[in-house]
Amino acid sequence: RDEELLQKIILRVKELRHMHNHQSQEQLAEATELGIAQLESGKNFPNLTTISIICKFYNITLDEFFAPLHYPPKEK
């Protein structure tokens, strides 16, 4: 498990919820049928299908989801 990547994904999901009228975990979970609380607590590492469902819900592309993550960091 890549904990750094997981934390970046968790922060991105939280950011999207807050950008869209401060939706609760429950609202997103109900709309997507996903375990958002478990994802945001780091208990579940999301797969690409899970992230794709979140992207469809927020009407964004996978590129738009991952663009602000800047991962993996460039070697110096």
Briefly describe each language-model feature range.
Residues N21-Q38:
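Short alpha-helical DNA-recognition segment
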